Amino acid sequence: MTIHSDFRSAAELVSAAHTVSVVGHLRPDADAIGSVTATVEALRQLGKDARGYIGQTDPMPSNLNSIPGSEEIIFTSVLPVSDLIIVVDCGSQERTGEFQESIIGARDRTIVVDHHATNPGFGRVNLISTEAESTTTILLDWFDVLGVQTTRTIAHGLYAGLLTDTGCFRWGRPVMHDMARRLMEHGLDIREISAELIDKTSLEDLQLVGRIMSRIEMHRAGPYRLAVLVADHATINGHSKAAVEGLIEMVRAVDGADFGAVFKEYEPGVFTVSLRSSHLSVGSLAVHLGGGGHVPAAGYTARGTELEALDTLIAAAVELGESLTTTHMANG
């Protein structure tokens, strides 16, 4: 069965539903929020009672508030009962956060839309394309099947996911530019969107980034050179998560590094680890360590001290060795 036939199966589930919950992933990014807002708007256009949800009570990074419709997304630990659940941009059930048990119990009325290679397909219908640059690009094609008219709000959400998940169009298939063109035709101010999602920062955030970046180190991990940055709990507690999450893009660009890693200690002794590389399959490395993601961009959770977490990553890179270079790096 192709994803196009799955589009039709998913459309049938949408047609039969009245109330629909659209769920994005824990610690959402622009692809998650853009996917939720665009899907909610599309469903309402089809006459559905649709709402967007994130399975956490912590707020999202403030720059994501620039995506139209984001103000309506509900951050909560309880997912209301609905006729249909559409899970977007979640590579696993765990990524739905507090909603995990509810999602497990509602498989027969769940549609999964995602582009992560590690997604096992946990819905009744799974619209998964690992070639897709972002979840929003899959939604663009599905909305065509549903007969949804692309509004400026829908276009904004879809473009936000495409822009950020391609690193501002630095990787992806040629078709991504055609998708961007389609979305731009709906009157998007792409300069403003980029400014809000990529460029805008505060003096406090820049000062925080400076303190953390001064600690960057280079380590040997078998045949590879690893740029490492640790954002410890004492330094980042109470500060902007958006600033901390953006650190990996600077670390990945260090000259001479094969891949970059940022260890973010949001809770004492628990590190959210982001991995990036332009030529290695850090997705395989993350899966080996219990996480997931894409070939060039992935992550996992580590526990223990800073030294223990780093030693575990280095040992995994040494164990996997040259296999990390075997995956095709055409897109993210």
Model-derived regions: residue spans:
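Local beta-strand N-terminus motif with an aromatic residue
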Residues: 82-83, 123
